[in-house]
Amino acid sequence: GKFREPVIRITNWARAFGATSQSGKYVFVSTASNIDLSQAPLTSPSVFNFWRPGYTPPNSTQLGQHNLVAPEFQIIDEVTAPAYVNLIQETVQNGIGWAAEGFTGHDVRAAYSAEIAIADNASALVDRLNRLLFYGQMSTTLRDRIIAGVNAVPIPAVTGSNQAAIDSAKLTRARTAIFFAMISPEYLVQR
């Protein structure tokens, strides 16, 4: 498979979930730091993109034995791997980018309306993510694990006065499913 570039992952999130800008300006902070994505659009240091074209990851016996290269893996290390998990958690939860003048919080956010609408049905929610993010290629094992994670977030029974708690639980279930999907190895390595 091919390792998805970090900027492509954020772009997938924005497209899949209809992320929009509060200000209309799409105010993004630089994502080039190794505690963000280690990559920023239009800042490639060479015509070969962000990585050396002949790079083979250390200890990758399968690639080495077959004389293959995987330049996109050069961006992964012990700092960037957890940094992506932290960034995607923040992005799914609160959005991404700077607060534009006159606004609070991250500028680019997703409402997750379609996901919230089906959040009471974990299977339907994960099937939707399978279509949006995995192009129908999610394994049964990953699907079952994400469903279990979503079902770990209970939705309160309707009492007539707790709609806010129900809505909050559905939003949490949607965000949980998206987060688990986007940090999974199956999502990170496109097949």
Give residue spans per PLM region:
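Flexible, low-complexity segments enriched for small/polar residues
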Residues: 1-191
